[in-house]
């Protein structure tokens, strides 16, 4: 919430360089948030459509098709699995310090 973020920055004495605290900060954060949302949504749309486009261009069999959303899910699960494996390795590394 840009309004809440601007208020919190103002209360804590923080500011964005070149932007006055208060309403100007709120408008700036809103503008940046809209830009990031637009870029992110365009990127996700391209990722979702690209696999279908390549499958149709390469004339692959229907069994080889994978949708963009499926690709996003697979990558998300793979990244989460890597994080969990890394945390387990770190946990094992620190187990020697506990004993």
From Swiss-Prot:
Give a yes or no for keyword Cytoplasm in this entry: no
A Pfam family: SecY
Q: Name one GO cellular component term.
A: plasma membrane
State any GO BP term from the record.
Answer: protein transport
Keywords, ordered alphabetically: Cell membrane, Membrane, Protein transport, Translocation, Transmembrane, Transmembrane helix, Transport
Per its UniProt entry, which superkingdom is the organism in?
Bacteria
Does the UniProt entry include the keyword Protein transport?
yes
Q: How does it sit in the membrane?
A: Multi-pass membrane protein
Q: What does this protein do?
A: The central subunit of the protein translocation channel SecYEG. Consists of two halves formed by TMs 1-5 and 6-10. These two domains form a lateral gate at the front which open onto the bilayer between TMs 2 and 7, and are clamped together by SecE at the back. The channel is closed by both a pore ring composed of hydrophobic SecY resides and a short helix (helix 2A) on the extracellular side of the membrane which forms a plug. The plug probably moves laterally to allow the channel to open. The ring and the pore may move independently.
Query: Which family does the UniProt entry place this protein in?
Result: Belongs to the SecY/SEC61-alpha family.
What is this protein's record name?
Answer: Protein translocase subunit SecY
Q: Which organism is the protein's source?
A: Geobacillus stearothermophilus (Bacillus stearothermophilus)
């Amino acid at each position: 919430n840009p309004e809440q973020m601007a208020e919190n920055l103002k209360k804590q004495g923080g500011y964005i360089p070149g932007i006055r605290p208060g309403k100007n900060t709120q408008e700036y954060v809103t503008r940046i948030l809209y830009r990031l949302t637009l870029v992110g949504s365009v990127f996700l749309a391209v990722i979702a459509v690209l696999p279908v486009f390549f499958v149709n261009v390469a004339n692959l069999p229907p069994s080889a098709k994978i949708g963009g959303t499926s690709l996003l899910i697979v990558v998300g699960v793979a990244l989460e699995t890597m994080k969990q494996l890394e945390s387990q390795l770190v946990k094992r590394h620190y187990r020697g310090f506990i004993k």
